[in-house]
Amino acid sequence: MMKTKYLLLPLLASSSLLSHMAFANNHWPDLPIGVKNGVSAQIGSKVYVGLGSAEKSFYVLDTQAPQNGWTLLAEFIGPERSGATATVVGENIFVFGGSGKASDDASSPIIFDTVYRFDTQTNRWHQVKTQTPVGLLGASSYSPDGKQVLFFGGYSKPLFDKYLADITRTDKKAQPEQWQKIVDDYMGMEPLAYQWNRDVLSFNPTNDKWDVVTRSPYLPNCGSATVIDGPSITLISGEIKPGLRTAEVKTFTYGELQPWQSTYALPAAKGQAQQEGIAGAYSGVVSNTLLVAGGANFHGAKAQFESGQMFAHNGLSKAYNSEIYAKQKGVWQQVGQLPEGLAYGASFSVKGGVLMVGGERADRTASTKVYLVGLNNNQIDIVD
């Protein structure tokens, strides 16, 4: 998944609501092509984005010299994939999992269990001689110590591979009832039946070994926005089963005796009865305030689920949200809106704000836009 690598700073002393927005243009260069459902990473002032809808392309932008634009790097050496997760260790970017076809003539997509390493010093990709122990599609990852990578969530490879194979080989027009039964059976399961990864896994790049650090007390979820503060990671929202999100926000601190901490959940968006939760949102820190923006969900899915409908998003349209939330004094507030609803892009904390890169629009196209969301005198500034 597209992930965030940020320093979580102390919250603002002021509790004033940020309610106004200002817009400025033509500072941040757009992507050469739209990127959604890809991977992202940050090393110093350089931000990296690619894969997903960009196929095998991988780009870098020096945020201290945006006038130089995006540079195309070496082409990814593995099969094209979406929904992978990436983490930096040293000067290397490690890419784990994702979903796609193993070959051009493959009958259906699969969840990949492969790992790749991009050396930013030599501009070269390498396949790592290891295999992920679980499916990491939609997982979140980070390095708590610059030595290892920790993972949260991720789809079940056996279950999702079977679903993709069944739905791909069934002709929807010729066999509509059978096709619909496959969808209903898979989408109608309870959250735990999906067997998403509930363990906090560790990967050591030095010896390519995997380990289980602990187990999450929460329902496993995928597509969370993430914010990193040294050994801690904050996991914001995400989905707990296909089509159903959670508004939960929790923090994991590596090395602590009790590593998990629940925090305030995201509030309901203005005009909505409850917060559906969001997946694929953008997040970061600006002016000592944690921001979360955009993300996708299905308005009404939570109500249907609470009424007993396990196929929670059945009959609902996918919503691409534009709300911006800020966390002040430990409490979330809605403080503004993006120029458009976006999800499944990349976000980075940089000087002046949160840099939002690419993503998926409501018409399902991949965006090339790059926005900087900042704060100025308690006002949301959006620079593109």
Curated annotation (Swiss-Prot):
Residues in Kelch repeats: 46-90, 92-145, 147-184, 185-230, 233-281, 303-352, 354-383
Reactions catalysed, as given in the entry: N-acetyl-alpha-neuraminate = N-acetyl-beta-neuraminate
UniProt signal peptide: 1-24
Keywords noted in UniProt: Carbohydrate metabolism, Isomerase, Kelch repeat, Periplasm, Repeat, Signal
One Gene Ontology MF term: racemase and epimerase activity, acting on carbohydrates and derivatives
Documented EC number(s): 5.1.3.24
Domain of life, source organism: Bacteria
Predominant subcellular localization, coarse grouping: periplasm
Active site feature: 239
Family label: Belongs to the NanM family.
Subunit structure: Homodimer.
PANTHER family: ACYL-COA-BINDING DOMAIN-CONTAINING PROTEIN 5, FIBRONECTIN TYPE-III DOMAIN-CONTAINING PROTEIN
HAMAP family: NanM
Entry protein name: N-acetylneuraminate epimerase
Organism: Vibrio vulnificus (strain YJ016)
